[in-house]
């Protein structure tokens, strides 16, 4: 029935058109802190759309279920590429211009690599090269 449509849209990543990665228009130093990729049951209204709406050094970043002002983390060696290869992605994203949750491997915790996923770039466990 019609009651299933919002769930289907959420599953396809369409329900949050405002979900733009804060780093795209960022001019403040540092990077948004890494976040756990978990399924959100209820998205909160965005608290900001750009870094300049945030006080002091805070950046406008995606959090688990919202976009809000968070303290930046230092970009430790942005050119370092971690070992391993990104897993092969099958399928096509239904969302136009999906947000990237990382840009470089150094923004990912531990051994995780910044890889292309079905919808945007995310931190993933690499496969052996």
Swiss-Prot record:
Ranges where the WAP domain occurs: 25-73, 79-127
Taxonomic lineage from the root: Eukaryota, Metazoa, Chordata, Craniata, Vertebrata
GO biological process, one term: innate immune response
Organism: Sus scrofa (Pig)
UniProt-annotated stretches for the region Elastase inhibitory domain: 81-129
Protein name, entry field: Antileukoproteinase
Signal peptide: 1-22
Compartments where found: Secreted
Gene that encodes it: SLPI
One annotated GO molecular function: endopeptidase inhibitor activity
Cellular compartments per GO CC: extracellular space
């Amino acid at each position: 029935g019609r009651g299933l449509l919002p769930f289907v849209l959420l599953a396809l990543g369409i329900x949050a058109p405002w979900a733009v990665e804060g780093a795209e228009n960022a001019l403040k130093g540092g990077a948004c802190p890494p976040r756990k990729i978990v399924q959100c049951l209820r998205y909160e209204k965005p608290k900001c759309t750009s870094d300049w709406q945030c006080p002091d050094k805070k950046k406008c970043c995606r959090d688990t279920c919202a976009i809000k002002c968070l303290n930046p983390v230092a970009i430790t060696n942005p050119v370092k590429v971690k070992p391993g290869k990104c897993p092969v992605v099958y399928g096509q994203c239904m969302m136009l211009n999906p947000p990237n949750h990382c840009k470089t491997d150094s923004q990912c915790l531990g051994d995780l690599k910044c890889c292309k996923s079905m919808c945007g770039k995310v931190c993933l466990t690499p496969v052996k090269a």
